[in-house]
Each structure stands twice: as C-alpha cells, then as structure tokens.
C-alpha cells in the first residue's frame, strides 16, 4: 500500500480503538437502567464471583443482573442485523483484523457454547464496570432491546490468530 493508504489505515485503527471499553480488572455487568442505582460495587461484589461462565445471571434485590464472567476483556457493542453483539477480545494481532471480521456475520456457522434466557421489566439496559457503585462507574454503555424477554447466545470465535467471545442478544 502507498504511504498515504498506510497512514489512513493507522488513523482508522486509532479511531476504532476508541470503540472498545475496558474495566479496571473487574467484570462488566448488565442491568436494567431503572435498577442500576441499586448496584453498590464492592458491597455487591461477592455475588458476581459465583459466575464462572462467560455470561451468568444472578439476582440483586429480585432484579436480573448479567455478569460477564471469565477474565476481563476489552469489549465493544455492535448492532448488527437486529441483534446486539457484545464482542469481547481475548486476543488478536490488531484492531483492524477484528474490524474486518465484524463486517461479516461473524457468528454464522458457529454453535453457541452458552445460552441464557432473560426476562426484563423494561427494554432499557446499561452495561458498566462492576467494581464501583453505578453512580461512580466511569464507563456506562446504554442498550435498548426490541422486547423484554430475550435469549443471549455466547459464541467462541477462534480462527488463526484471533479469539473473541461474542454474546448475541436476540
């Protein structure tokens, strides 16, 4: 590629790096926006430690809380073909490689490794770092679902030098 094309690719990669979020080493959690203030951070933290899967469902004050288990990973939210994809980066050589994969139907032909069924009271959710109380969380990503009940399928994408965990909310 020309020098200008290479510089352009670098700028695109730097721009796309801003689309990924990370925690301070604790899991991300997802809860309905109307109940998010009930999350007390350290006070509730032991409850999420019981989750050993990539995605687990627990209850705080009788409300569903989803926990992204395993190890903390850089995460990106993508809306694709009517589904919300939560992409978690295990490893890849660079951002551009992952971005190219996301242009296609990345989970096509892959069997889910986990499924979680969830019934919410509303369609407005928020994803945030579980370490802090919700009001102090530095990263908050708001999600809008099509309906209050959904199935979340988890896929392990592993090819060549790329490994991603993908949660598809349908």
Features from the language model and the residues they span:
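N-terminal amphipathic/basic-hydrophobic helices that include classical n-h-c signal peptides
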Residues: 1-15
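Primarily secretory-pathway and cell-envelope proteins
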Residues: 11-110, 160-170
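Extended, solvent-exposed segments with strong compositional bias
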Residues: 102-138
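Beta-strand-connecting loop/turn residues
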Residues: 123, 159-160
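Phosphate-end processing signature that detects enzymes handling 5′-triphosphorylated RNA
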Residues: 141
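Surface-exposed coil/turn segments at beta-strand junctions on protein surfaces, enriched
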Residues: 145-147
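A short tyrosine-centered beta-strand micro-motif
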Residues: 150-152
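Short beta-strand-plus-loop segments that form exposed binding edges in beta-rich domains
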Residues: 156
């Amino acid at each position: 590629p020309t020098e200008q094309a290479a510089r352009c690719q670098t700028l695109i990669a730097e721009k796309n790096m801003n689309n990924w979020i990370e925690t301070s080493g604790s899991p991300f959690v997802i809860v309905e926006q109307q109940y998010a203030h009930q999350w007390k951070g350290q006070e509730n933290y032991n409850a999420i430690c019981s989750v050993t899967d990539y995605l687990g469902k627990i209850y705080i004050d009788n409300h569903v809380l989803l926990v992204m288990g395993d190890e903390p990973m850089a995460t990106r939210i993508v809306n694709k073909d009517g589904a919300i994809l939560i992409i978690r980066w295990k490893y890849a050589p660079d951002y551009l490689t992952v971005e190219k994969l996301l242009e296609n139907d990345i989970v096509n032909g892959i069997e889910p490794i986990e499924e979680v069924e969830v019934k919410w009271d509303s369609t407005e959710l928020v994803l945030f770092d579980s370490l802090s109380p919700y009001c102090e969380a530095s990263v908050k990503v708001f999600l809008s679902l099509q309906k209050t009940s959904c199935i979340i399928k988890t896929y392990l994408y592993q090819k060549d030098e790329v490994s991603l965990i993908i949660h598809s909310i349908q």
